[in-house]
């Protein structure tokens, strides 16, 4: 009787691409020795739609509906960066009330994004129950979005110089009720997840990134803060009105998948704290800067003179971008979302470069999964939190 021969050659496995509603159309070519990962090559581009080139053939107003398709789970941030770029370029001031409304919407969107990270991440680890729990709170956030913007997703709410509409009557009370309810929900998540020995076994020490590595790879967001680097653009750049609220940067020093989970859970608590303070301090006044609603053909134009044309209802579609360049960034749920904008005295941007956080954070994946087990790939990929819409653009 001859003994069965054992093969020593490596095995190549294709993981993905999956449907965009799941982890997105990401393909991983994984080289395995048994269950040990020898190499991993991400294949990108399945969801590429030419978002940068579209921007260079549209006015900013025309382009606004497109941007919600980058990160379609945190659409307020893509809208914010799209209007912030021309606002900084032309030095447009926004009313204080509009700034507070923006902060409230951004933090609600951050919570919604982190919730839809938490559910699938736990499902990847084999815990299906939290996936159903997170939709409870997420639907309440979408109810708030629908009441304020008319849309549950793809809100199209931000405008150059402010927001599209003021908060409706009774919205603030509903938002405060949600904040009180959600804090109890976070405690429930922690009781359900954090003490689970199977969960801890799957995430502790898995996907370790040191602080130096995180900086060298250009990581941002929870990926960076989980490695001991206290860097949050809301504190660094002081955009909108974040400097008027009392909150702390959430960080961990361990640098593994568990640390990234803890950072995101803590960030949701801080977001609630910011929302409550913003609602308490929100001033009256206009929700949009009427100065944006005019053509400014001459830099020295004065009120009501011949050069000063006032438009009635909407910002001018002929909003010209002056000949200069700048880089603007916001702290999105996944990291630093930036726009490099070059204007040339025309209606369209000459260059519109998107700096997506997911694309940069994904680059470290092959290094993290090497010498790990095959089952750890989904743990590490889930802890990075990517949306292929913004990765491929």
Curated annotation (Swiss-Prot):
EC number: 7.1.1.-
InterPro entries in the cross-refs: NADH_Q_OxRdtase_suD, NADH_UbQ_OxRdtase_49kDa_CS, NDH1_su_D/H, NiFe-Hase_large
Main location: plastid
Record carries keyword Transit peptide: no
Pfam family, one: Complex1_49kDa
Enzymatic reactions: a plastoquinone + NADH + (n+1) H(+)(in) = a plastoquinol + NAD(+) + n H(+)(out); a plastoquinone + NADPH + (n+1) H(+)(in) = a plastoquinol + NADP(+) + n H(+)(out)
Entry keywords, A to Z: Chloroplast, Membrane, NAD, NADP, Plastid, Plastoquinone, Quinone, Thylakoid, Translocase, Transport
PROSITE patterns given in the database record: COMPLEX1_49K
Alphabetized GO MF terms: NAD binding; oxidoreductase activity, acting on NAD(P)H, quinone or similar compound as acceptor; quinone binding
Topology term for the membrane: Peripheral membrane protein
GO cellular component: chloroplast thylakoid membrane
EC primary class: translocase
GO biological process, one term: photosynthesis, light reaction
Protein localization: Plastid, Chloroplast thylakoid membrane
Family under the similarity heading: Belongs to the complex I 49 kDa subunit family.
PANTHER family the record matches: NADH DEHYDROGENASE [UBIQUINONE] IRON-SULFUR PROTEIN 2, MITOCHONDRIAL (PTHR11993:SF10), NADH-UBIQUINONE OXIDOREDUCTASE 49 KDA SUBUNIT (PTHR11993)
Function of the molecule: NDH shuttles electrons from NAD(P)H:plastoquinone, via FMN and iron-sulfur (Fe-S) centers, to quinones in the photosynthetic chain and possibly in a chloroplast respiratory chain. The immediate electron acceptor for the enzyme in this species is believed to be plastoquinone. Couples the redox reaction to proton translocation, and thus conserves the redox energy in a proton gradient.
Subunit structure: NDH is composed of at least 16 different subunits, 5 of which are encoded in the nucleus.
Name of the protein in its database record: NAD(P)H-quinone oxidoreductase subunit H, chloroplastic
């Amino acid at each position: 009787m001859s003994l069965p021969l054992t093969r020593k050659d490596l095995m190549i496995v294709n993981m993905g691409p999956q449907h965009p509603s799941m982890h997105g159309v990401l393909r991983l070519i994984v080289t395995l020795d048994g269950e040990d990962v020898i190499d991993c090559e991400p294949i990108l581009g399945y969801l590429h739609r030419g978002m940068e080139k579209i921007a260079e053939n549209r006015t900013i107003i025309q382009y606004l509906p497109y941007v919600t398709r980058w990160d379609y789970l945190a659409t307020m941030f893509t809208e914010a960066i799209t209007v912030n770029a021309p606002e900084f370029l032309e030095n447009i001031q926004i009313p204080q009330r509009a700034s507070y409304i923006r902060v409230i919407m951004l933090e609600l969107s951050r919570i919604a994004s982190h919730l839809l990270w938490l559910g699938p991440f736990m499902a990847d680890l084999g815990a299906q129950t939290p996936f159903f729990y997170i939709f409870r709170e997420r639907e309440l956030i979408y109810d708030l979005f629908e009441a304020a913007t008319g849309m549950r997703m793809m809100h199209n709410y931000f405008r150059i110089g402010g927001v599209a509409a003021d908060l409706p009557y009774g919205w603030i009370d509903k938002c405060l009720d949600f904040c009180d309810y959600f804090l109890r929900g976070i405690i429930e998540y922690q009781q359900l997840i954090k003490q689970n020995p199977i969960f801890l076994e799957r995430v502790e020490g898995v996907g370790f990134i040191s602080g130096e590595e995180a900086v060298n790879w250009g990581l941002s967001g929870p990926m960076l803060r989980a490695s001991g680097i206290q860097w949050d653009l809301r504190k660094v750049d002081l955009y909108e009105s974040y400097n008027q609220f009392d909150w702390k940067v959430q960080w961990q020093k361990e640098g593994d998948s568990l640390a990234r989970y803890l950072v995101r859970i803590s960030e949701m608590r801080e977001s609630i704290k910011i929302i409550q303070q913003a609602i308490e301090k929100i001033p009256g006044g206009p929700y949009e800067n009427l100065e944006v609603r005019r053509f400014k053909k001459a830099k020295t134009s004065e009120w009501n003179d011949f050069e000063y044309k006032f438009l009635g209802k909407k910002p001018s579609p002929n909003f010209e971008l002056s000949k200069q360049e700048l880089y603007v960034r916001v702290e999105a749920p996944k990291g630093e979302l930036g726009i490099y904008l070059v204007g040339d005295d025309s209606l369209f941007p000459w260059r519109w470069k998107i700096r997506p956080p997911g694309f940069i954070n994904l680059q470290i994946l092959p290094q993290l999964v090497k010498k790990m087990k095959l089952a750890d790939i989904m743990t590490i990929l889930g802890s990075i939190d990517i949306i292929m819409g913004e990765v491929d653009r």
